């Protein structure tokens, strides 16, 4: 029996290693050599900022996508950091999709970056919910393969209260514990299982500032 249990433990460990991955996200322009360095370090996903919280396209986005493709990064996502004070959430999504129209086939996810209660959002849960719903509704028909939400238990409730309107979308959450696993995740606002975790932030690697991410 002990032998069987040991075999099961080893099999589970190998399975988890085989089907877990690490990636990076960047908020600045990244050249081809940078992505080649990340690929050599076994990072297989790049998440690139394409819309800034000031309410405009990040023009580093398309060159960074091109460089990630040339370097052979397997999975490329983009993220949109919305500008609440700018209004018109639908336009922010369509502006992003139009900017990326020639790259939509190359992208896996559009992530909506929802963070910063009291800093990037109003003091009204209802107004914030309406804005986020506008982002989600527009994103569903904008041509992206998948749409997800970047947020955390320390951020989302402070923006929308107990609202669970994002629960049907994959969640990418942040907890800088340095652990490449989901053992720390606690369900909140309807989310019961994470898609991806940002486990380390503000790291300098390959000469660039990055955050590190884990997914299975």
From Swiss-Prot:
GO cellular component terms attached to this protein's record: extracellular region
Superkingdom of the source species: Eukaryota
Keywords in alphabetical order: Antimicrobial, Bacteriolytic enzyme, Glycoprotein, Glycosidase, Hydrolase, Secreted, Signal
Coiled-coil annotated residue ranges, if any: none
Top enzyme class: hydrolase
Keyword Hydrolase: yes
GO annotation, biological process: cell wall macromolecule catabolic process; defense response to bacterium; killing of cells of another organism; peptidoglycan catabolic process; signal transduction
Active-site residues annotated for this sequence: 25, 113, 115
Catalytic activity: Hydrolysis of (1->4)-beta-linkages between N-acetylmuramic acid and N-acetyl-D-glucosamine residues in a peptidoglycan and between N-acetyl-D-glucosamine residues in chitodextrins
Signal peptide (UniProt feature, chain positions): 1-20
EC nos: 3.2.1.17
Record-annotated Ch-type lysozyme domain positions: 21-216
InterPro entries noted in UniProt: GH25_Enzymes, Glyco_hydro_25, Glycoside_hydrolase_SF
Pfam families xrefs: Glyco_hydro_25
Entry similarity comment: Belongs to the glycosyl hydrolase 25 family.
Record-linked PANTHER family: GH FAMILY 25 LYSOZYME 5-RELATED, LYSOZYME PROTEIN
Protein name: Probable GH family 25 lysozyme 5
Organism of origin: Dictyostelium discoideum
């Amino acid at each position: 029996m002990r032998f069987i249990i040991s075999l099961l433990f080893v099999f589970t460990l190998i399975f988890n290693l085989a089907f877990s991955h690490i990636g990076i996200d960047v908020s600045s322009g990244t050249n081809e050599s940078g992505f080649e360095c990340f690929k050599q370090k076994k990072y297989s996903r790049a998440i690139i900022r394409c819309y800034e919280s000031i309410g405009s396209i990040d023009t580093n986005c398309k060159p960074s996508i091109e460089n990630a493709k040339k370097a052979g990064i397997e999975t490329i996502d983009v993220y949109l950091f919305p500008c609440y004070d700018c209004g018109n959430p639908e336009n922010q999504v369509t502006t992003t999709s139009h900017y990326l129209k020639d790259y939509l086939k190359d992208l896996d996810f559009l992530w909506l970056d929802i963070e910063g209660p009291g800093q990037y959002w109003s003091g009204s849960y209802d107004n914030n919910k309406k804005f986020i719903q506008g982002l989600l509704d527009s994103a569903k028909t904008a041509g992206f393969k998948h749409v997800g939400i970047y947020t955390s238990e320390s951020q989302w409730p402070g923006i929308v209260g107990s609202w669970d309107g994002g629960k049907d979308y994959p969640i990418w959450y942040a907890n800088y514990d340095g652990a490449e696993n989901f053992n720390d995740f606690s369900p909140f606002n309807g989310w019961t299982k994470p898609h991806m975790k940002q486990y380390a932030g503000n790291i300098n690697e390959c000469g660039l500032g990055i955050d590190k991410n884990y997914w299975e």
